[in-house]
């Protein structure tokens, strides 16, 4: 019997009596991170990393939360369980499950480049690895994040010369905090959409150091924004809310900006290839370093990525789940099928 089963409620460890990132309410849920496609309301008990707990409280409301540190060991009905850094966002964790000599690891979402706030991705040796493949095609290859940060700084400087407000679109948990760190040493006044401001306040209350942030508010005079920087979720694009910053220009921060057509279709002033997910090489590196004999692929470019792993001699299979992009990130990826041929064999 498999240590983790793929059920209609989520990833289930029968021996331990718990689910990992269930998409339906269950008795005991172990959560990899606070994004809405992995952390859902309604379960009776939640286990997560210490930094994830306040974010679950923000998003799901009061609940029965238990939190642990990375590497701390728990036993559930004789099953050994521990959390390890995934590098996706603050608090994001891989879940290591061990029982009767068998080790499985559930990655959740992850990236392999250390962003300085999410914890460096930790390869965890296992027999079976359950991975995402959001950017599981060879066309997705990230440049070092510092190069992207430099481009963002230069773009903002050019906008200021023409009196334009720079509006950066980035989802409220993960990317927004990276941008705040990126802009921390500037003398610019930083403004944020309410969703980003609320997350910022919670994180600051729990010891995180981010630059001062002003919430966008109807009572603020319009000229206060001119030449400044506004950080907003992608869902704000094209709304009446964003038009109050006129004259403004939009910069989208997403891995989907690797494909230029996405930027053209969304009429953005700039696209910055900044992702909280591993690229093609990062996915392959992570899998190699686990030493896994079996790899299950939960979401993303599952067919192409799983096929490639099988061709490399690693048993791999697709798994149907309800994971995908964080809701607001999905707005950026809806056109990806026009740019990437899913039937094309990876050529690396």
Regions from the PLM with identified roles:
Residues 65-69, 187-194, 313-322:
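Short hydrophobic/aromatic-enriched beta-strand-loop microsegments
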Residues 149-227, 231:
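Hard-cation-handling environments
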Residues 57-58, 76-80, 115-117, 139-141, ...:
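Short, charged, surface-exposed secondary-structure boundary motifs
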Residues 10-23, 72-75, 212-228, 234-241:
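Short acidic low-complexity segments
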Residues 87-97, 110, 114-115, 128, ...:
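Active-site-proximal loop/helix segment associated with metal-binding centers of metalloenzymes
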């Amino acid at each position: 019997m498999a240590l983790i089963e793929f059920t209609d409620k989520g990833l289930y460890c029968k021996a331990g009596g718990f689910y990992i990132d269930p998409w339906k309410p269950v008795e005991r849920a172990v959560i990899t991170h606070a994004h809405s496609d992995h952390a859902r309301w309604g379960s009776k008990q939640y286990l997560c990393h210490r930094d994830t707990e306040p974010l679950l409280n923000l998003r799901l409301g009061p609940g029965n939360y238990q939190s642990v540190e990375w590497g701390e060991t728990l036993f559930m009905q004789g099953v050994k369980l521990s959390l390890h850094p995934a590098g996706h966002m603050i608090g994001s964790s891989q879940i290591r499950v061990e029982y009767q000599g068998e080790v499985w690891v559930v990655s959740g979402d992850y990236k392999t480049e250390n962003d300085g706030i999410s914890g460096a991705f930790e390869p965890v040796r296992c027999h079976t690895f359950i991975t995402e493949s959001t950017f599981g095609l060879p066309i997705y290859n990230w440049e070092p994040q510092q190069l992207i940060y430099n481009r963002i700084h230069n773009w903002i400087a050019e906008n200021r010369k023409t009196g334009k407000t720079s509006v950066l679109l980035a989802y409220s948990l993960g990317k927004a905090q990276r941008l705040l760190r990126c802009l921390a040493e500037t003398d610019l006044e930083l403004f944020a959409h309410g969703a980003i401001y609320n997350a910022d306040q919670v994180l600051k209350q729990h010891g995180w150091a981010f630059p001062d942030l002003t919430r966008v508010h109807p009572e603020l005079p319009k000229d206060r924004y001119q030449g400044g920087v506004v950080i907003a979720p992608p869902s704000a694009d094209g709304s009446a809310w964003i038009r109050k910053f006129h004259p403004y220009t939009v910069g989208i921060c997403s891995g989907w900006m690797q494909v230029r057509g996405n930027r053209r279709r969304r009429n953005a002033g700039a696209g910055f290839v900044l992702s909280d997910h591993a690229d093609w090489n990062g996915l392959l590196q992570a899998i190699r370093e686990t030493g896994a004999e079996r790899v299950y692929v939960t979401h993303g470019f599952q067919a192409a990525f799983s096929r490639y792993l099988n061709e490399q001699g690693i048993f791999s299979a697709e798994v149907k789940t309800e994971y995908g992009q964080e809701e607001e990130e999905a707005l950026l990826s809806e056109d990806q099928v026009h740019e990437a041929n899913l039937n094309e064999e990876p050529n690396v």
